[in-house]
Amino acid sequence: QNYRNYFDKQTGFMRGKLSATEWRTPFSPFVSRHMKDDFTEGNAWQYTWLVPQDVEGLIALQGGDQPFTQKLDSLFIAKGDMGSEASPDISGLIGQYAHGNEPSHHIAYLYAYAGQPWKTAEKVRYIMDNFYTTKPDGIIGNEDVGQMSAWYVLSAVGIYEVNPANGTFVFGSPAINEAIVRLPKGKQFHIVVKNNSAKHIYIGAISLNGKPYTHDFIRYSDIMSGGSLTIYMTDKPGNFGTLPADRPHSVF
């Protein structure tokens, strides 16, 4: 939880320090100086969210669910000059969100932790539709050991690991209608998506192995056990996954 020491409550951003009590100045959440600044290939707008190990703590640090989601909303529309020394890897921009660089990849899924999974669905589907093609230059940024493609594969199936260390996948907005995950010892995990379309981007309900499932996440252990997951899509945001007990958690 050392990240808390770098959160400036006055500006609402993570920022660099000269000492335990002194912030580095001048400061702009937009500016990025490649290899010369406190952020690598990014700025404070992008790196403030890089706390996958304690999303609940980050939400509390920002004042709760509503201020947290309002800040996320602002991220996707904020406009500002990153400066002439910004890395070219900061690409695929939606406001200050940079899908072309991996530190941003989990951000669209953070809405689910604060009870607004429909915004995760909207952002994830937009990114898949607009930042990936089948052309030779079909990815929006640096592939970096396959992460740009891995984000798409997981998101297209409808899940994503915000915290890879805690064994859970957050639901998003599946782009395909069926997937089979082949597992050891002849097992398989079968994902079927019903009523999916360009307009039906929101998850309305889910069943796991034929039983109603209300959580907005699925555990790795459930997938590895084999079975079936059916996702029912709708064209309007609903209440699926919004209750505190059904939201994903970064710490279990």
What are these regions (language model features)?
Residues 1-175, 179-190, 221, 228:
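Active-site core of glycosidic bond-cleaving carbohydrate-active enzymes
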Residues 201-205:
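Beta-strand-rich binding/interaction modules
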Residues 210-219:
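Solvent-exposed beta-strand/loop surfaces of large extracellular or lumenal domains
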Residues 194-195, 218-222:
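Short proline/glycine-enriched turn/loop segments at secondary-structure junctions
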Residues 220-252:
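C-terminal beta-strand-rich structural cap/linker in extracellular carbohydrate-active enzymes
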Residues 184, 207-211:
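Short strand-turn-strand beta-turns centered on an Asx-Gly dipeptide
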